[in-house]
């Protein structure tokens, strides 16, 4: 048997997600258990959304958890480069190879033509999908349009009938009718590959033997398997893990619970406990013990024992497990060092002291001034907002609109944060001083604090959003109907002036 090679391939387009860590953990344990290699590849073909800051946050977060990869963008390896943006010269030739073999074709349809196609399909009660119009062009027509410099994409051909059988390591045989699979774009008009082409090409060139990923990719598996067949390559073994769920069984979403690893790090969760908890997502030790280390998990790991029932990511259970680790796994000296590294690290002090120094008479003043920077949720109630000028309901609405704008931000620094809040206040016809007061309370527990955008920059996007969300709930939150009404108002507000800096 050849060497087992697995990978995690995150896109650096946002905060490092606990779901990424969960998939990475299972990939690493499977590879290590078989004496194989675990790779990290950055899938940053979406250059409008990908950022170096997000990539670094992903690497730092996974390392904080204790996950190490054998090959990757920061450690190198024999199959690099490990960023897709640095492999752009590779993908085009493979797309053209498929065209030459008759497995893919040029499509010159404009966005307007495709929109019209979808409208006509919907009018007939059909599911909108590409109708294969590019396949009707003759070779001469294609060449003529290429010579004329018309923009095009390259799409893969899909069987018109029959069933694709997917042999899944966990789920057995999965059947998907080819009629449900679209003629996927492989190469976009700007020459950039889509996820599907780049993913298959890279997995082959990096000799990945097992693709262990979330179940949301099951519907893409027919396209991927067909691409392997078209290229004449051996497909890797597929294994689709169940998605993490909220306690109400809904898909894990930052709208309901914090999903960023950085949030849990900022809250003071231990990396050992976090990794332990993720290891229990659909899997358990043979002896059913609650607590185990990464080394112990690797030793006993069996991918076939993963349960397909949606694993529940319950913050209360994570907190309980974290408390066990704190009480049972550390000496006083070790715990003192952890607390020092977490709360009194030099980086945090250097960010906080410029704001605290002018307000300090003695060193003991620092704790009450800056303690909120290393706290969890602020102990706010409706009374905490009573002294602010705006009515409580209007404060709550501003917090909700601010949260939506901040969730869409791609950069997190004080000037950008202030610009977002100022623009929102102007759109709502409010003075910035009045509008921003509830944000002060949400972030610091009081309006008597450091400049709020500086505080938000220090505690970071995950904790800032979580505290604002907590404050909204402390003010009573919103019912479903009110939430829908606010979404409509927010959309209109955004149209009034400068659009939020969103991830388009």
Swiss-Prot record:
Catalysed transformations (reactions): tRNA(Glu) + L-glutamate + ATP = L-glutamyl-tRNA(Glu) + AMP + diphosphate
UniProt entry keywords in alphabetical sequence: Aminoacyl-tRNA synthetase, ATP-binding, Cytoplasm, Ligase, Nucleotide-binding, Protein biosynthesis
Record note on quaternary structure: Monomer.
Family per record: Belongs to the class-I aminoacyl-tRNA synthetase family. Glutamate--tRNA ligase type 1 subfamily.
An example Gene Ontology molecular-function term: zinc ion binding
Species this protein is from: Cellvibrio japonicus (strain Ueda107) (Pseudomonas fluorescens subsp. cellulosa)
Any matching Pfam family: Anticodon_2
Positions annotated to bind ATP: 254
Cellular compartments per GO CC: cytosol
Entry keyword Phosphoprotein: no
Its job: Catalyzes the attachment of glutamate to tRNA(Glu) in a two-step reaction: glutamate is first activated by ATP to form Glu-AMP and then transferred to the acceptor end of tRNA(Glu).
CDD domains recorded: GluRS_core (cd00808)
Span of the annotated motif 'HIGH' region: 10-20
Subcellular location, record wording: Cytoplasm
Gene3D superfamilies: 1.10.10.350, HUPs
Enzyme class: ligase
EC number(s) given by UniProt: 6.1.1.17
Motif 'KMSKS' region: chain residues: 251-255
Listed name of the protein: Glutamate--tRNA ligase
């Amino acid at each position: 048997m050849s060497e087992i090679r697995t990978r995690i391939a995150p896109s650096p387009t946002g905060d490092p997600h606990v779901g990424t860590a969960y998939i990475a953990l299972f990939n690493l344990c499977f590879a290590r258990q078989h004496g194989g290699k675990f790779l990290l590849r950055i899938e940053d073909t979406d250059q409008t959304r990908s950022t170096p800051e997000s990539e670094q946050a992903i690497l730092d977060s996974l390392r904080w958890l204790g996950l190490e990869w054998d090959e990757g963008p920061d450690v190198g390896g024999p199959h690099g480069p490990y960023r897709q943006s640095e492999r752009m010269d590779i993908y085009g030739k493979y797309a053209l190879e498929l065209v030459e073999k008759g497995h893919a074709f040029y499509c010159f349809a404009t966005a307007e033509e495709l929109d019209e196609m979808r409208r006509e399909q919907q009018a007939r009660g059909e599911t909108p999908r590409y109708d294969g119009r590019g396949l009707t062009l003759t070779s001469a027509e294609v060449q003529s349009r290429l010579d004329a410099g018309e923009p095009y994409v390259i799409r893969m051909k899909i069987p018109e009938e029959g069933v694709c059988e997917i042999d899944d390591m966990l789920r057995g045989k999965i059947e998907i009718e080819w009629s449900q699979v679209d003629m996927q774009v492989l190469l976009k008009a700007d020459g950039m590959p889509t996820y599907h082409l780049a993913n298959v090409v890279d997995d082959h060139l990096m000799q990945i033997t097992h693709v262990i990923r979330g179940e949301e990719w099951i519907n893409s598996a027919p396209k991927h398997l067909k691409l392997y067949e078209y290229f004449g390559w051996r497909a890797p073994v597929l294994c689709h893990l169940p998605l993490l769920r909220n306690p109400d069984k809904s898909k894990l979403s930052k709208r309901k619970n914090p999903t960023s690893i950085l949030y849990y790090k900022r809250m003071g969760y231990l990396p050992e406990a976090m990794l332990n908890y993720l290891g229990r997502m659909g899997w358990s030790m043979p002896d059913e013990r609650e607590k185990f280390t990464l080394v112990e998990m690797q030793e006993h790991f069996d991918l076939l024992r993963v349960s397909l029932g949606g694993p529940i990511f319950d913050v209360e259970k994570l907190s309980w497990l974290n408390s066990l680790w704190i009480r049972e796994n550390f000496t006083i000296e070790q715990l003192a060092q952890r607390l020092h590294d977490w709360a009194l690290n030099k980086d945090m002090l250097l960010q906080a002291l410029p704001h605290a120094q002018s307000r300090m008479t003695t060193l003991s003043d620092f704790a009450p001034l800056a303690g909120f920077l290393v706290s969890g949720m602020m102990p706010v109630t409706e009374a905490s907002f009573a002294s602010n000028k705006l009515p409580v309901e209007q404060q709550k609405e501003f917090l909700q609109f601010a949260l939506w704008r901040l969730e869409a931000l791609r950069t997190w620094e004080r000037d950008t944060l202030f610009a977002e809040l100022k623009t929102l206040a102007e759109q709502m016809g409010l003075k910035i001083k009045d509008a921003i007061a509830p944000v002060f309370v949400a972030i610091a527990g009081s309006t008597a604090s450091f400049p709020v955008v500086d505080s938000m920059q220090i505690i970071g996007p995950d904790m800032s959003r979580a505290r604002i969300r907590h404050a909204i709930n402390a003010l009573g939150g919103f019912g479903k109907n009110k939430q829908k009404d606010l979404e409509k108002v927010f959309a209109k507000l955004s149209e009034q002036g400068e659009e939020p800096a969103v991830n388009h």
